[in-house]
Design a protein with these regions (language model features):
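Extracellular/periplasmic metallocenter environments
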Residues: 3, 15-31, 84-128
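Short solvent-exposed loop/turn micro-motifs enriched in small/polar/acidic residues
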Residues: 42-43, 74, 86, 113
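N-terminal edge beta-strand
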Residues: 29-57
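Soluble periplasmic/extracytoplasmic beta-strand elements of cell-envelope proteins
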Residues: 35-39, 59-61, 72, 104, ...
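Glycine-centered loop/turn positions within well-structured domains
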Residues: 43, 69, 99
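Non-catalytic surface loops within mature trypsin-like serine protease
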Residues: 40-42, 64, 75, 95-97, ...
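Extracytoplasmic/periplasmic/luminal assembly and interaction segments
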Residues: 50-92
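N-terminal Sec-pathway targeting helices
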Residues: 1-12
Length: 128
């Protein structure tokens, strides 16, 4: 009787708990496309933070509002664009990292150039 009860409890645990856990572990969220329009002004970007998940495609349209401005993602040489007033620049990339990665202005746009940066914050796929 005790052995039968133990089997029943084990099977019930598998059906209710472990099966759900296995399903959750095997679940992969579908990558999204995130469209972001960034306005670059002397000394700052709007917005300054892009939130994404690892595996998402981010499409950035950079608009220079006063003078030329750049957008380069630290450690990713292929993510590097420059926009001029009235001439937006665009780039798309797949987020292939976890955590935060900085972007910064690559064009010496004036005295506040050094403060021109932002952050792409990526969370792991499991945290969706």
């Amino acid at each position: 009787m005790v052995r039968s009860l133990a089997k029943f409890v084990a099977v019930a645990a598998l059906i209710t708990g472990s099966a759900v856990s296995v399903k959750a572990l095997n679940h992969k969220a579908t990558p999204r496309r995130i469209d972001v329009e960034i306005e670059a002004h002397m000394g700052h970007y709007t917005p300054r933070v892009i939130e994404a998940h690892k595996g998402d495609t981010v499409h950035v349209v950079l608009k220079a509002m006063d003078t030329a401005h750049g957008f380069k993602v630290m450690g990713h040489d292929n993510i590097d664009i420059t926009a001029m007033p009235g001439m937006p620049a665009e780039v798309s990339f797949v987020v292939d990292w976890d955590g935060g990665v900085e972007w910064f202005c690559t064009f010496n746009c004036g005295p506040q150039h050094g403060s021109m940066s932002g952050m792409i914050v990526a969370t792991a796929d499991e945290k969706r």
